[in-house]
C-alpha cells in the first residue's frame, strides 16, 4: 500500500511567516503552495519551490479567493463561474512560471479554504475549478475531497484525481469537513491523529463526529501546516504509517 502526505506551505506574505515550512518539507511528500491570493508572494513562492526541489517533494498550486486579510477562508458571494476560472488559471500559471525559474515542475492543483469548501457543495464552483485546471494543463492531478462535488467535477472533466482525507479535521455525517467555527473542528493530539490516519489508510474510511463510518478512497492525507503542533503531528503520522508497512510517497512524480 502507498499513500501520500500533503501539506499547505508557502503561506506567508512579505516579512510575515506561517508555520515551519523547512521542517514540514522533510516529512511531506507533496506540498501545495499558496499563489499570492490568500497568501504567498513571488519571493516566498520561489523559496518554497526551491526547498521542495531540494527535498524531492512534489509541488502543486494552492489557489484561493483573493482575500489576504481573511486568509482565503471567507466565501465570496456572487462570484461567477468565469471569475473562478480566471482566478484559478491565474494562480496555477503564476506557480508554473516560478517553478520553471526554480527548476521544478507543478504536478497538481488543490483548492484552498473557502474556495474548496464551497466547491465541495456547489456544482458551479466545482466545475469552474475543474474547467480552469483542464484548460491550463489536463495532465495536472486534481486533489479533491473524496465523495464531494469537487470529485464529481474532476471526473466529468476527465482530470486525473487524487482523493484526499484530512488528518487533523473532523468530518460531518455527509462527508464534508466540520466548519472551523465549530468546537472540535480541528484535532491536535498527535497520537490520536496518527491512529486515525492509519485507520483511514487501512479501512478506506473516515469516522464522523457522530461515529458514522464513511467510505472514502484515500490517496493522500493532508496535514495543515498552520495547525498547532503541525510538525509533531506530521512526524507521528509518517512514523505510524511506515511502521505499519505503508509506503509514504508522492502520488505524482517529482
Swiss-Prot record:
It is an enzyme of class 3 (hydrolase). SUPFAM superfamilies: Glycoside hydrolase/deacetylase. One of its GO terms (biological process) is carbohydrate metabolic process. Pfam families: LamB_YcsF (PF03746). InterPro entries: Glyco_hydro/deAcase_b/a-brl (IPR011330), LamB/YcsF/PxpA-like (IPR005501). It catalyses: 5-oxo-L-proline + ATP + 2 H2O = L-glutamate + ADP + phosphate + H(+). The keyword RNA-binding does not apply. Transmembrane segments: none annotated. Keywords: ATP-binding, Hydrolase, Nucleotide-binding. It comes from the Bacteria. Its EC number is 3.5.2.9. GO terms for molecular function: 5-oxoprolinase (ATP-hydrolyzing) activity; ATP binding. Signal peptide: none annotated. Forms a complex composed of PxpA, PxpB and PxpC. Catalyzes the cleavage of 5-oxoproline to form L-glutamate coupled to the hydrolysis of ATP to ADP and inorganic phosphate. HAMAP family: PxpA. Belongs to the LamB/PxpA family. This is 5-oxoprolinase subunit A. The gene is pxpA.
